[in-house]
Swiss-Prot record:
HAMAP family: HSP90 (MF_00505). It comes from Marinomonas sp. (strain MWYL1). It comes from the Bacteria. This is Chaperone protein HtpG. Residues 568-642 are annotated as: C.
Amino acid sequence: MATDTQKETLGFQTEVKQLLHLMIHSLYSNKEIFLRELISNASDAVDKLRFESVANADLLAEDPNLRVRIEFDKDTNTVVIDDNGVGMSREEAITNLGTIAKSGTSAFLEQLSGDQKKDSQLIGQFGVGFYSAFIVADKVTVETRRAGVAADQAVRWVSDGSGEFTIENIEKDSRGTRIILHLKAGEKEFADNFRLRHLVTKYSDHISIPVEMEKPVYPEMDEEGNPKPVDENKAPEYEAVNSAKALWTRPRNEVTDEEYQEFYKHISHDYQEPLKWSHNKVEGKLEYSSLLYIPSKAPYDLWNRDMQRGLKLYVQRVFIMDEAEAFLPPYMRFVKGVVDSNDLSLNVSREILQNDHAVDSMRSALTKRVLDMLGKMAKNEPEDYQKFWDEFGNVIKEGPADDMGNKDKIAGLLRFSSTHTDAAAQTVSLADYIERMQEGQDKIYYIYAESHNTAKNSPHLEILRKKGFEVLLLSDRIDEWMMSSLQEFEGKSFQDVTKGKLDLADQENEEEKKEKEEKAEKMKPLLDRMKAVLNEKVAGVNSTDRLTNSPACLVVGEYDMGLQMRRLLEQAGQKLPESKPTLEVNPDHPIVAKMDSETDEERFADMAWLLFEQATLSEGGQLEDPATFVSRMNKLIVQLSK
């Protein structure tokens, strides 16, 4: 029966056009990856069919021997990648081959700079997949039939990569997908038996599905040593070119670094090498194998809530799902890898994974394995760990709140900038800080501000710098939230130097204590006058010894929300209970001394407001009425210039 072809021409999604153009130019120097990408996709399609066949064994009836097959033809300059996997319907072909169904695609494309080397790294992180075919081909034909449908429901998709594709219905005898690459004139090297076999063993040896090529036929010799005629009608025989054994099932000592690296590229579609990996087999009450990777670069969508994350899940070597999120906590969403369990059911679902005791045990063990891997890297390979931290540090900072059971381990992995060097780079561990603590010091001091410069130049640090106390400088948006989950580390409690009383009493002698108390008593009338002026904005005005150069600073209560966190939540539209800071003033500052003798109440009020507004600005805050601040400042300058 003739098939109604329903042939139509459609346009690529705008992002596909951009990606195709950039990819062809940026990845040309690494063009052989096209075969790895297409074999990887074919392997995934076979894995998906194997999974679907668990519930419907009839899907395998016509051809139970799952495989990927590579063919080539020197005369027509073509290479074919053929699989007998799950295949695609017409709608799936249009969606999968004509659009990029990834959230954040537009944002990713905006990151591309035109620098070929940088762009090639970004595109590699994004994952080129099927579109890599156009690096070596000027035309690509895809013939595909969904498993379980009739032969006349197959489709043919054709494009030259310029912006459009045609799609039509065809008849196809077998399920699965056949991709025909019509190679560019300069890419004939790939229509070669030896070249293709070499690429399969180089990039795809670890894939658990057999990757087959036609078995070479060597003519038999007659008694006189001449080749016998070859039967041209004999059906070709195929042989597996790869080892076709799941890499994670092999003993670690039998797997080379190159094989681990290529397997990472296969599962992550990232063609940069991983920073670290851990391969482990667990036997006993629970039996499972895991292979976990730490990427070398953060993905472009790391901060996208909808980013695909999680491990590839296999049950007894049968592929179950991608992005199984249940096996690692959200702050480890950058980890790639595979987990293969003998204890889960083949019909496991995402919902079941959320409520399974075996999964909970595996999650706990895998989380500790990742933390141990990072801990060893931090101890033994600090340069590599610093690279990791620079890429993923802000995600690890989610850990103390997410994972209370491993809070101490996570705290040991954190890195900060500090007054030890004042550099913005986050290189200081809490262990480093404790090692440099002064005798008698029992607190780890830190400050949080909206920028590194605001933090390191904060008036709150003045007395601490003078007395030689190191202070951690925090300026990432997540930092204040993270610190709210950290109470102590190795017996040392944390103190935000902008909150409550800065207790350096243990480091003061009796004479200093007495002098401070006398100053505070002498200052009381001035402080009361200032409080009367600023009553609507401050909870109180106190004398302080935490300042040495600045006239004033703002301090919140020990248990109150920090000013930066308060601003963030208010900007997000959250209603918060009213809370006023305390203004602390430096009794030794000339401005404060001048105010003490000021008899003009209007000028005194202007000076009090200016101190409050300067303190607000110095800790990164914004003024409610900048124009009035400028007016006050100008008025005082004029008065002083007379």
